[in-house]
């Protein structure tokens, strides 16, 4: 009798409308219940209600009150956690197809169907890409997904690569070529094949895009400086602006350097053969002449030319470094001309390093961690590799060449793709000032430092560099790591702007056009200026894509590395191996540390640091943990740790600090 009673329906609606409504994000637990995290409060979600939602869903909920207890009742979906996602295939006891989401906080199986476009016969554990089709809060149906793409079999040793690339929607294949290739750039080129250019790179490198030649500048038989000639491969000589290769390069933006192999931005026959500055092969190049005095100051405007060059030798970083460091049984140059080039480049590099330490910024050296892999992708070892003198020779030549390109593009083209960094985020300038004063000021220098580290001064390139030079000699990384959190991100811009991170007025890369799309764009601009041809300012969508691609590539590299670290360290738990580590982050939940030996990232739960969580306080300004009122751990601290758990399924490594 009450079934269709409009008064009753109205009453129910009024009761519902009178209840408090909130918006928040669902957080699951390892139990059946969960929580709704709102701006100022967290609400309990009971197990039956958790079946309607998923960890990470943004939802609307009503608050049900029973006595003094409150709990959230999910009402509607604002934004689902899952749309496109990575998953593993499973079959339930009735042999029904399901997927398990590859996410540490989502463990409920989701029913699934296989799209017709997926031809593989799916097996338990296969990796796939799926899309969520129905959601209980949105569609009044249970969770259901469609499998749209097969990635690889469960037992595929290269799963870390294929799964990660699929997650970030990146291709595992090089760009398809367009043979035969024709030289489109028919304008006259200078013939510089007689100059004794050399390339210095890793032994395994195929895509060599730079070669160097140097000679002293003398007046009245006395050396007064250096003439450095930087030759850069010229792929735009073969790639038309309206070609498919150009469009693909514009989308990829970078060659993706992954543990074990790379995925080139250009077709391999261009990057590794036709454009690569292979020894004793004549290649088209864009060349820059740079003159400096003996102290490394640039003394003339850079001179760019289109040319043909011929590298006379491919040299390996480690061999050149061994030779210059006079290591036992070191490699020796095959020809006196090569030895002469190495020694001159070495002298030039020492001058430029000193110039940068004085006039710009030079970073404390940190190692690169390299995975040594077997054919099947198994990690054999992880090496911490420091930049040696041969690496610095190439680095200094590229940096000065990029400084010159920024100057040339700014003056001649009035545009380009410039690498910029504006230092401290404006909203954190006050924090940076306060932090520096708290850590460096005393009674004697208080007034001087208040001016030196004023907000106005820190916002300028000179003031920022001055501050960096002040903290450079300090042994600990604490100041550097803490200040880093106040910085903005580096940006690509189409007009000249400073690069605070390098301490330079302008910086525009053009030295890796085989590997970076921004460098291809700058090549085209430089060549257009030289040929007096029209050109266009780089579009904002190109700059935005470069920014996004750089971010994606870093995530891909990090995700693969995290997976490989888990595989490598899994059997080290039982042996109780001890490692030195640097504290990288400090949170209420614990510490994030990096093993110095191999670069792996570990989580140290706060519960293992002290048995009474009420006595642990986080100081977010200092990025430090206080235990019983004493500052016990801060970022930059070196601690001794051991591994306690490695979970490959969630790519997480847990450890504890050894007291």
From Swiss-Prot:
Database matches in Pfam families: OB_RNB, RNB, S1
GO cellular component, one term: cytosol
EC number, as in UniProt: 3.1.13.1
Any one of the GO BP annotations: mRNA catabolic process
Alphabetic keyword roster: Cytoplasm, Exonuclease, Hydrolase, Nuclease, RNA-binding
Record domain RNB: where: 189-531
Occurrences of domain S1 motif (ranges): 576-658
Alphabetized GO MF terms: exoribonuclease II activity; RNA binding
InterPro entries for this protein: CSD, NA-bd_OB-fold, RNase_B_OB_dom, RNase_II, RNase_II/R, RNase_II/R_CS, RNase_II/RNase_R, RNR_Ribonuclease
Catalytic reaction equation(s): Exonucleolytic cleavage in the 3'- to 5'-direction to yield nucleoside 5'-phosphates
Compartment annotation: Cytoplasm
Superkingdom of source: Bacteria
Enzyme class: hydrolase
NCBIfam families named in the record: 3_prime_RNase, PRK05054.1, RNase_B
Family from the record: Belongs to the RNR ribonuclease family. RNase II subfamily.
Primary role: Involved in mRNA degradation. Hydrolyzes single-stranded polyribonucleotides processively in the 3' to 5' direction.
Name listed for the protein in its UniProt record: Exoribonuclease 2
Origin organism lineage: Bacteria, Pseudomonadati, Pseudomonadota, Gammaproteobacteria, Pasteurellales
Gene assigned in the entry: rnb
């Amino acid at each position: 009798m009450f079934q269709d009673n409009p008064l009753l329906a109205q009453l129910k609606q009024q009761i519902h409308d009178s209840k408090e409504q909130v918006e928040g994000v669902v957080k699951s637990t390892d139990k059946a219940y969960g929580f709704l995290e709102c701006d100022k409060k967290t609400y309990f979600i009971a197990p039956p209600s958790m079946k309607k939602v998923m960890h990470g869903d943004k939802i609307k909920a009503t608050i049900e009150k029973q006595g003094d207890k409150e709990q959230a009742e999910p009402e509607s979906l604002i934004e689902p956690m899952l749309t496109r996602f990575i998953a593993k295939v499973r079959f339930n006891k009735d042999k029904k197809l399901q997927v398990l989401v590859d996410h540490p906080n989502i463990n409920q199986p989701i029913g699934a169907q296989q799209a017709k476009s997926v031809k593989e016969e799916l097996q338990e554990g296969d990796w796939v890409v799926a899309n969520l089709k129905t959601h209980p809060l949105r569609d009044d149906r249970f969770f259901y997904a469609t499998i749209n793409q097969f990635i690889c079999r469960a037992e595929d040793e290269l799963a870390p690569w294929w799964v990660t690339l699929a997650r970030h929607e990146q291709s595992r294949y090089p760009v398809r070529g367009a043979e035969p290739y024709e030289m489109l750039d028919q304008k006259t080129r200078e013939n510089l094949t007689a100059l004794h250019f050399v390339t210095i790179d890793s032994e395994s490198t195929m895509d060599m895009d730079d070669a160097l030649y140097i000679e002293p500048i003398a007046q009245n038989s006395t050396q007064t400086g250096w003439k450095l000639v930087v030759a850069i491969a010229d792929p735009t000589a073969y790639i038309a602006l309206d070609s498919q290769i150009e469009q693909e390069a514009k989308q990829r933006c970078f060659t993706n350097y992954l543990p074990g192999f790379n995925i080139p931005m250009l077709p391999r026959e261009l990057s590794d053969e036709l454009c690569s500055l292979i020894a004793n092969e004549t290649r088209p190049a864009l060349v820059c002449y740079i003159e400096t005095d003996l102290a490394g100051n640039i003394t003339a405007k850079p001179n760019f030319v289109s040319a043909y060059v011929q590298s006379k030798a491919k040299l390996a970083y480690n061999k050149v470094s061994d030779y210059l460091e006079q290591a036992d049984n070191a490699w020796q140059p095959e020809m006196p001309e090569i030895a002469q080039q190495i020694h001159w480049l070495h002298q030039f590099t020492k001058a430029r390093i000193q110039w940068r330490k004085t006039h710009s910024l030079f970073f404390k050296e940190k190692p690169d961690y390299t995975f040594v892999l077997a054919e099947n992708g198994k990690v054999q070892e992880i090496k911490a590799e420091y930049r040696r003198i041969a690496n610095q020779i190439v680095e200094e030549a590229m940096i000065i060449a990029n400084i010159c390109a920024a100057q040339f593009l700014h003056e001649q083209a009035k545009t380009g793709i410039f690498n910029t960094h504006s230092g401290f985020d404006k909203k954190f300038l006050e924090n940076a000032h306060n932090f520096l004063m708290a850590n460096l000021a005393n009674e004697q220098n208080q007034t001087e430092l208040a001016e030196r580290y004023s907000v106005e001064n820190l916002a300028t390139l000179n003031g920022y560099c001055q501050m960096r030079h002040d903290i450079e000699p300090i042994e600990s990384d604490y100041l550097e790591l803490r200040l880093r959190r106040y910085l903005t991100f580096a940006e690509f811009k189409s007009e000249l702007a400073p690069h605070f991170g390098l301490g330079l007025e302008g910086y525009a890369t053009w030295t890796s056009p085989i590997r970076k799309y921004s460098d291809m764009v700058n090549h085209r601009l430089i060549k257009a200026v030289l040929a007096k041809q029209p050109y266009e300012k780089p579009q904002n969508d190109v700059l935005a894509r470069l920014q996004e691609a750089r971010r994606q590539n870093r995530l891909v590299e990090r995700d693969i590395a995290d997976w490989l670290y888990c595989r490598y360290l899994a059997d080290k738990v039982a042996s109780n191996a001890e490692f030195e580590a640097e504290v990288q982050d400090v949170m209420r939940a614990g510490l994030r540390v990096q093993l110095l030996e191999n670069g792996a990232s570990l989580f140290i739960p706060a519960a293992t640091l002290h048995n009474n969580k009420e006595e642990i306080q986080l100081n977010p300004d200092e990025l430090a943990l206080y235990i019983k009122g004493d500052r016990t751990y801060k970022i930059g601290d070196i601690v001794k740790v051991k591994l306690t758990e490695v979970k490959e399924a969630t790519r997480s490594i847990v450890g504890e600090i050894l007291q």
